Amino acid sequence: MTERMSGVLCPVVTPFDDDLNPDPARLIRQCEWLLSQNVGLAVFGTNSEANSLSLEEKLLLLDRLVDAGIDTTRMMPGTGCCALPETVALTKHAVNLGCAGTLMLPPFYYKGVSDDGLFASFAEVIERVADTSLHIYLYHIPPISQVGISLDLIERLITAYPDTVVGIKDSSGDWDNTNAMLERRWDDFRVFAGAETFLLRNMRGGGAGCISATANINPAAIDRLYQEWQSGEAGELQKDLDVIRDSTMAYPMIPALKATVAHFSNDQQWRRVRPPLVALPDDQCSALIESLLQKGFDMPGLN
């Protein structure tokens, strides 16, 4: 039986080559480094530029990661797409490869859809994948998707599929919303904060951890707070994490993360993003890195 996930996971940034094709070799190396820092892999998350990748590219990248020996029990790939058949195909592939979970956006192009419609969408995926090892972690990110997952919808899905719908990533940025989920006390339902900003509060409320963009660059420190959230140092650890995150959030997040990886890996290829995103300009890269270095920041072992 597949174990439910907890801890710190990273929506791994996706490297691109000169022709803007995904670069599997660089992605594999990055995933190996992240695993060495004790964080799991939420590939094809928002910060992975997932919705700038085709279904075929995602399927191939999953295959390449697994072929390289990346531990699938530490993987929660994002599989939610706008088109039902694509969500089914990607989810089924992830399950067949042995991924411990899938992080699933609702179909997000059409706005103002009802809970009935969203329930039907998730239910269709579950019924069509038809695999008892499927574990879905819902992905609530209304600032980006503009299609939210309500508490009532979560309740309906858990009631209908208690062994399949097992958790959620709350990227609403609204602690009251995350706390409302925790207060429902759903049986072994794993609530992940969408940023380490809320990690300490989430753990104190009975949460499972966090799935955070800045785990791409600060994984060990975030994991340390997850491991030591009950210690007397937890408050200071949280403050230290917030300082690094604030430095990164002063810039567009995905280009900033890639610029940071590029600098500390000594590999400028990492700065590439797919349109419509644009790479961080040189002057902003320099300012970001200088800000991080002034705080004693490093990414040991990356290069």
Where are the regions a protein language model picked out?
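Active-site beta->alpha loop and helix N-cap motifs at the rims of alpha/beta catalytic domains
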Residues: 2-148
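C-terminal alpha-helical cap/extension of soluble enzyme domains
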Residues: 4-13, 37-38, 214-303
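A generic secondary-structure micro-motif detector
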Residues: 20, 51, 80, 188-189, ...
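Surface-exposed charge patches
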Residues: 32, 92, 200, 259, ...
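A general structural signal for well-ordered alpha-helical segments in protein cores
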Residues: 58, 62, 87, 122, ...
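Alpha-helical structural signal in soluble globular domains
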Residues: 60, 64-69, 93, 97, ...
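Catalytic alpha/beta core domains of metabolic enzymes, predominantly
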Residues: 130-134, 141-251
